[in-house]
From Swiss-Prot:
It is found in: Periplasm. It catalyses: 2 Fe(II)-[cytochrome] + nitrate + 2 H(+) = 2 Fe(III)-[cytochrome] + nitrite + H2O. This is Periplasmic nitrate reductase. It comes from Rhodopseudomonas palustris (strain BisB18). Catalytic subunit of the periplasmic nitrate reductase complex NapAB. Receives electrons from NapB and catalyzes the reduction of nitrate to nitrite. Gene3D superfamilies: 2.40.40.20, 3.30.200.210, 3.40.50.740, Dimethylsulfoxide Reductase, domain 2 (3.40.228.10). Substrate binds at W800. One of its GO terms (cellular component) is periplasmic space.
């Protein structure tokens, strides 16, 4: 195909459009895009990549020159973002070039030897791995597999997470590996599994253009998923009948578009959800045919506790904690009687939301002529009843049959770029294996051991330490060798003073942190490993709509920085298999004696079957250069074998480098947009119409679950609710975005958003320095009574991106007892003026 020739006037016009687009982030005309990427005189090489930030999964075009990323812009060929980027995406080219980028391993030393209390000194990779292997072997000798652990990430690439999970579950025989997605998506996973028997959304982003109503539950899409919000906004403003409802514990930017805004008391969303279900039933709008054919009813266990330490009074008092995930059968009539108690008036009394607003919201769901898409994220998931909240949202769509078709979709949004693709699909959680398999299921372990060529009994049959429990075990000295990758848990983990930091500095423990920058977590470690970022390695992410996206390595990492994948595989060479497997296992597979973990796990005839010559010409691949084969392709194809044939099908590896992502299941080259719906999902049997095939009976579960209060609420001593979260300009702990000058200047430090009347009552003015204090710790910050976030009286909001203000010292480490996900949205604090000393 030839590119049409342009005359000089057209060239100048398009060049101006292209440069304006690159500077301002607007979409480029196709011809202008061609000019930038194909113009013969251009010195820039452009390639596609998935954005490094949130779970939306935008595609960007990346320009490189002289082994450096010099520009990015939105990918006009992407179905997700259609050429646009958010403000963070515009500055992707700068995230790798902070002045304090780590370029060599650093070990704490005194007088030339490792010392837990020593200063960081540069060391070689050999010395770093020597001391690391020594400490891991000592922990294994002392405690067995339970003595070692890893905290991974929803920012791992697919093959990094897969290699890490394999290293621990098959190599070290320890399930003590968990991703930071435990803090963001675990409740969504458990909600999917309980309701549908299979994980991840049934809908896709195409629902946005087909919906009549959007309902946001605990989701500030305007700032956290801004490119999706542009599509919602376009739909709302271009179709007069479309409505937007937003529910939150405080007003934020998403309320600007809302036709119906509901601010409720923390935790009371549970009562509102049940009241809507009751309204649907009482007004005769249940889709009886759909419910009869496709659902069954369950009564969930109640009084399940709050995931605190066993000795905590709330845990001791919880009668249902031991069976938190249990449920019993019930009839529709029993369910209707259960929710009948949740009248709109009662929900109003519990939540503080006017009854008329709750009824208006209920009508949006109940109206059989409206298509409803519900979006939610951390407001639901970071919740001590987060799994219940997910289940109750699905109830509304199942009762009305508004599910698995264009515009009718309950949609859990993800916060990290591969929380779906890596944490969930790969199964890097402490209880999971790839493709929704779990370590507690013998059949699933058998499948994994067969694919991984392991002797029977290699994978432990009990879940390992989840994220919060890892911190507790480190503190208690029961987890002694710990590796953190793509993570900043000292800034992110709740109750950091009491439960996270003590474990890092416990003299019995050895802590390794792989990072690109000296984060709070890295600086508390014993060994820091410098790590490659984003397009400094070949990668793959899976976004919130089941879309898997690949990119090539485009530039080299600085200095001695290496990818997480290289680190995992290279470290495996330090262990003979006899050092990690029992004699019983070795007797079942004697041919592995004398081999290293690397040989057994990564040179097994599958991972190493693709030659480096398969790499597309013109691209770097440092891992394949180091190991002598196409590492990423081998790992991906082995991983993909877990899901092919039972609803998790991934396309062949090479397809993804050609496409802007594909939504699984991908069968016969065709992606799936709407799961469980005949005609869209190849796994639905002919004539079924809808089939929730995650369960053998093909039915989804509708749960009866009550409102239960939060673990901690305001009182006379601590009279305010505290909620935490993100802001548009920064991502998570700010490790990347705070090193981008433009983003740093846009929002340089965290503040405490509070109601002006609360501030006046405390004799505070905007900008005053205050102390935000809970029973666990405090921070100093400044009052903000204006701006984007508008809390109601009695609630304050503090974002967590600022490492100089560790708000996680204040938060409570309560979790959902089913998902084990932390609740960062509610605890009790007091506000005091900081007086000059």
């Amino acid at each position: 195909m030839t590119t049409p020739k342009l005359d000089r006037r057209q060239v100048l016009k398009l060049e101006a459009a292209a440069m304006a687009a690159l500077a301002g982030g607007i979409a480029m005309p196709a011809a202008a895009a061609n000019l930038v990427t194909e113009r013969a005189v251009s010195e820039l090489k452009w390639d596609k990549a998935a954005c490094r930030f949130c779970g939306t999964g935008c595609s960007v075009m990346v320009a490189t020159k002289e082994n450096r990323v010099v520009a990015t812009h939105g990918d006009t060929k992407s179905e997700v973002n259609r050429g646009l980027n958010c403000v963070k995406g515009y500055f992707l080219s700068k995230i790798m070039y902070g002045h304090d980028r780590l370029t060599q391993p650093m070990l704490r030393k005194t007088d030339g030897k490792y010392d837990k209390n020593g200063e960081f000194m540069p060391v070689s990779w050999d010395e770093a791995f020597d001391i690391m292997a020594e400490k891991f072997k000592a922990a294994l000798k002392k405690r067995g597999p339970s003595g070692v652990g890893m905290f991974g990430s929803g920012q791992w690439t697919v093959w990094e997470g897969y290699a890490a999970s394999k290293l621990f579950k098959a190599g070290f025989r320890s399930n003590n590996i968990d991703p930071n997605a435990r803090h963001c998506m675990a409740s969504a996973v458990a909600g999917f599994m309980r309701t549908f028997g299979i994980d991840e959304p049934m809908g896709c982003y195409d629902d946005i253009e087909a919906a009549d109503v959007f309902v946001l539950w605990g989701s500030n899409m305007a700032e956290m998923h801004p490119l999706l919000w542009t599509r919602v906004t376009d739909r709302r403003l271009s179709a007069p009948h479309v409505k937007v409802a937003v529910l939150s514990t405080f007003e934020h930017r998403s309320f600007d578009l809302a036709d119906l805004g509901l601010v409720f008391k923390p935790q009371t969303d549970l009562a509102i959800l049940n009241a809507i279900a009751n309204h649907i039933i009482k007004t005769g709008r249940v889709n009886k045919d759909f419910v009869a054919k496709h659902t069954t009813f369950k009564r969930g266990q109640t009084d399940i506790g709050y995931g605190l330490r066993p000795e905590h009074p709330l845990q001791k008092a919880a009668t249902g904690a031991a069976k938190a995930n249990d449920a019993t059968d019930m009839s529709f009539e029993d369910y209707a009687a259960f929710v009948a108690d949740y009248t709109i008036e009662k929900a109003s009394q519990i939540s503080g939301v006017p009854a008329a607003k709750i009824e208006a919201l209920a009508e949006l769901y109940a109206d059989p002529n409206t298509k409803v898409t519900s979006f939610w994220t951390m407001g639901f998931n970071q919740h001590t009843r987060g799994v219940w909240a997910n289940n109750l949202a699905y109830n509304l769509h199942l009762l009305t049959g508004k599910i698995s078709e264009p515009g009718n979709s309950p949609f859990s949004l993800t916060g990290q770029p591969s929380a779906c693709g890596t944490a969930r699909e790969v199964g890097t959680f402490s209880h999971r294996l790839p493709a929704d398999m779990v370590v507690t299921n013998k059949k699933h372990r058998d499948i994994a051991e067969k694919i991984w060529k392991l002797p029977e009994g290699t994978i432990p049959d009990k879940p390992g330490y989840h994220a919060v429990l890892q911190s507790r075990m480190l503190k208690d000295g029961l987890l002694n060798a710990y590796w953190v990758q793509v993570n900043n848990n000292l800034q992110a983990g709740a109750n950091a003073n009491e439960e996270t930091y003590p474990g890092f500095r416990n003299p019995d423990n050895f802590i390794v942190v792989s990072d690109a920058y000296p984060s709070v977590t890295a600086l508390a470690a014993d060994l820091i490993l410098p790590t490659a970022m984003w397009v400094e390695k070949e990668g793959a992410y899976g976004n919130a709509e089941r879309r898997t996206q690949f990119w090539h390595q485009l530039v080299s990492a600085p200095g001695q920085a290496r990818s997480d994948l290289w680190q995992l595989m290279e470290f495996a060479k330090r262990f003979k298999i006899e050092e990690v497997w029992t004699e019983e296992l070795l007797a079942k597979k004697p041919e592995v004696r004398g081999k290293t973990m690397y040989d057994v796990l990564y040179r097994n005839g599958q991972v190493d079957k693709y030659p480096s010559s398969d790499i597309e010409a013109g691209y770097l691949n440092d891992e394949s250069k180091a190991f002598g084969y196409y590492v990423q392709k081998g790992l991906f194809e082995e991983y993909a074998s877990f899901g092919r044939g039972h609803g998790h099908d991934l396309a062949p590896f090479d397809d993804y480098h050609r496409e802007r992502g594909l939504r699984w299941p991908v069968v016969n080259g065709q992606e799936t947009r709407w799961r469980f719906r005949e005609g869209s999902d190849p796994y639905v049997q002919q004539g079924a119409g809808v089939q929730f095939y995650g369960f053998p009976d093909g039915r989804a579960r509708i749960f009866a679950l009550p409102y239960e209060p939060a673990a901690e609420a305001p009182d006379a001593e601590f009279p305010f609710w505290l909620s935490t979260g993100r802001v548009l300009e920064h991502w998570h702990s700010g490790t990347m975005t705070r090193r981008v000058p433009e983003l740093y200047k846009a929002f340089p430090e965290a503040v405490c958003f509070m109601h002006p009347d609360d501030a006046a009552e405390l004799k505070l003015r905007r900008g005053d320095e205050i102390k935000v204090e809970s029973r666990r710790g405090f921070i100093r910050t400044r009052v903000e009574t204006r701006g984007r976030n508008k809390p109601p009286r009695g609630l304050v909001f503090v974002p967590w991106f600022d490492e100089a203000q560790l708000i996680n010292k204040v938060t409570l480490d309560a979790t959902d007892p089913i998902s084990l996900q932390t609740d960062y949205k509610k605890c009790a604090v007091r506000i005091e003026r900081v007086t000059a000393s």
